Amino acid sequence: MRMEDIAKIAQVSKSAVSLAFSGKPGIGNETRERILRIAREMGYNAKPRVTATVQEKSSKQLVFLVITNLGIISEEYYQQPFFRELIHFVEERCRSKGYSVVFSSVDMEHFDQSIRAVADDHRNSGVILLGTNLSREQIAFVADKLPQLVVLDTCYDTLPIHFVEINNAMGAYQAGAHLCDIGHKDIGYVASNVRIHNFEERKAGFAAALREKGLEVAPSRTFSVAPTLLSSQDSMRQQLEGCLHAEGKLPTALFCECDYIAISAMKTLTELGYRVPEDISVIGFDNINESVIVTPELTTIHVEKEKMARLAVDLLTDPAEHGSNARSKTRVDTRFVARLSTCAPTAAVGVGSSVSKPG
């Protein structure tokens, strides 16, 4: 079975099949899903690479490698604002250095086999691995096959590999300190129901900020939702209603582990009749472009995505400047961004409030 055969069965071009296997933009989701389904049914294992012939022949190229269908990284990862922006800055930095970028996506279902295939094709190329959703063992396996590796958006201190990550603890600490400084004491925490390294560090950083003020997030004020939906979520609605029923009131502020969760939470609160921030303040993390489109504009933590991308590319394109054998762990500091979704607390929102209640 060849790519040409799959293209014929799916009634699409060979280039469309290549885009479907790679995770690159350029075809619709329905077409992509049909191609991938046909490939699975026919037992075809694609070499996980996307490139034009000119790029493959270039001696100045980097590989951007993503493991999909694992944790928060789906086949459509490039449609998620945070990753879309990060990839844009990687491409931009590569162009400025005279390098091309080969995008390669590997389905977790065929992880071992596909990583070996990538290594066969790109053993001498520098590789930026999106590590957001990966375990220590998975990253170690990739590094063993692809020695010129930089891992972006996670960090494992005991691995002798270049890592560039967000200072997650710092960002969440900034969020917690802000809520405490403007007077909030009854604070809730909205976590992702898919756990990754970044979220665990944010949880610790936020708890540290509250602990300094003698506060903590009560278990009844901790919620868990899907991290990749911008719409309101029934599960969030049910958890808020359960909290209100059990406690008689909701927290006066919510910290959300990412902007996606924060925007979803704001929409859910609005549907329930609560005002943001007058009744409940909401703060996110990432400062994606959508954070200034929502109403009210989202208070959040800015992640220096451009700087992270620049550092990752430079570690591969300028190895002499960083020491050819030395490995580094770089945490890029965050910046607090005050907008309109947080304010000082007013009366507790619950039974007896002027705001209409769910139920």
List where the protein language model places each region.
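Short acidic capping loops at alpha-helix termini that bridge into adjacent secondary structure
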Residues: 185-186, 217-221, 276-282
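N-terminal helix-turn-helix DNA-binding module of bacterial transcription factors
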Residues: 1-58, 354-359
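Short hydrophobic segments within beta-strands
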Residues: 65-67, 130, 152, 189-190, ...
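Hinge/beta->alpha junction and helix N-cap segments in small-molecule ligand-binding domains
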Residues: 71-82, 103-110, 164-174, 190-238, ...
